[in-house]
């Protein structure tokens, strides 16, 4: 199972000056640990009446599996920290994985934000391959509303790349807002003929106002010939 990781600022500054920005981004994904961990396992006591789960699919790769959940906000206000619970079953219908273990990073149990009347894809790339996972279902829990407009964050130039023989996607995140984005998650979904064939995510520890930061996401699945979709839901609201 490949861990998705983020580099702390001090480690980023310590990288050799001869490294390219892209190499630093790759090192960011490979060597650091996302520190926002859930102290307790995820429990959804009440399903959201504002968020619809439009679909949930499982993607298989050589080093594990990943779940992609498509969500829609049916309300007139933006939402933050949307809890998402997934249940993965094998072909016989037995549950083999749920994302409710204590210690999971927040990004593996929730979506940072969801715009009013907007849609988003959330990715859990830490689904173990043990137990022969075959299907996944998801529910979204109640989440707090955001007052005002969400800080604007955009992803540009998403394209296939390769790191140490592994399929990856690279691109740039730009923070167009005045709010520093902390622990910003970039989700990448690869579709071929409308079907999800690969997915992954990257975590950027910090994106300052007006800054552009490269990312690299390791992908689970087979992205060859697929169209990449990348997004970075707002994580910090000022």
Predicted stretch roles:
Residues 1-6:
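Bacterial N-terminal signal peptides that target proteins for export
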Residues 7-170, 174-182, 191-238:
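Membrane engagement elements in two modes
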């Amino acid at each position: 199972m490949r861990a998705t990781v983020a580099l702390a600022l001090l480690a980023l500054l310590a990288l050799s000056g001869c490294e390219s920005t892209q190499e630093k981004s790759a090192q960011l994904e490979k060597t650091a640990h996302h520190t926002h961990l859930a102290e307790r396992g995820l429990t959804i006591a009440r399903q959201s009446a504002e968020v619809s789960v439009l679909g949930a699919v499982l993607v298989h790769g050589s080093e594990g599996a990943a779940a992609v959940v498509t969500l829609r906000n049916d309300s007139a206000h933006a939402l933050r920290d949307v809890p998402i619970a997934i249940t993965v079953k094998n072909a016989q219908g037995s549950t083999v994985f749920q994302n409710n273990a204590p210690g999971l990073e927040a990004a593996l149990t929730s979506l940072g934000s969801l715009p009013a009347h907007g849609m988003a894809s959330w990715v859990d790339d830490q689904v173990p391959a043990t137990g022969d996972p075959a299907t996944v279902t998801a529910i979204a829990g109640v989440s707090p509303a955001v007052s005002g407009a969400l800080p604007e964050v955009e992803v540009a130039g998403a394209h296939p790349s390769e790191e140490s023989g592994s399929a990856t996607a690279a691109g740039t995140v730009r923070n167009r807002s005045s709010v520093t984005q902390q622990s910003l998650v970039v989700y990448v979904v690869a579709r071929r003929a409308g079907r999800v064939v690969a997915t992954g995510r990257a975590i950027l520890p910090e994106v300052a106002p007006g800054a552009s930061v490269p990312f690299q996401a390791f992908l689970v699945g087979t992205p060859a010939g697929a169209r990449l979709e990348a997004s970075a839901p707002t994580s910090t609201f000022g």
